[in-house]
Regions:
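Phosphate/pyrophosphate-binding loop motifs in nucleotide- or prenyl diphosphate-using proteins
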Residues: 1-149
Length: 149
């Protein structure tokens, strides 16, 4: 199940890459696609470790750089905005599913802890990328409105 969900996530990122994106963001996403294949390899081949702290640091640095260009959030936002941002949100939700799958798998099988952390950081990066893409494409974040009944 985990391999299928990783493949689904990778495919959604592939769809996202068909959208007009800044070149530096395309490079990040293409690197992520390769890393997702590596995580699949780790799950398929015993003692095959490809994801490490350097790859996690790469994601965190890119996440922080994009986040520094955005206003801080004080409310929840709804997925949407530009098409590219919507694909980021879709990828983020599948990434969260991958994280749950890997966490559950780790209860019975050996799973690289760095891969779990990478997937967690990837979902955060996809959220920030969605907001960043909305900003550069002149779409506002849509804030969740608490029911005031």
């Amino acid at each position: 199940e985990s391999l299928g969900n990783i493949d689904e996530l990778n495919s959604i990122i592939g769809i996202l890459l068909t959208e007009k994106l800044p070149d530096d963001k395309k490079i990040i996403l293409e690197k992520v696609q390769h890393d997702l294949f590596d995580i699949g390899g780790e799950l398929s081949i015993p003692n095959h470790i490809k994801i490490d702290d350097k790859k996690i640091d790469f994601l965190e640095n890119k996440l922080d750089a994009m986040n520094n260009e955005l206003e801080s959030l004080k409310e929840f936002i709804l997925p949407g905005g530009s098409k590219a941002s919507s694909y980021c949100h879709l990828a983020r939700t599948v990434c969260r599913r991958v994280e749950r799958n890997l966490f559950n798998l780790a209860q019975t099988d050996k799973v690289n802890e760095a891969s779990l952390k990478y997937i967690n950081r990837l979902s955060d990066m996809l959220f920030v990328l969605a907001r960043f893409l909305n900003k550069i494409n002149h779409f506002n974040d849509v804030f969740w409105k608490k029911d005031t009944k």
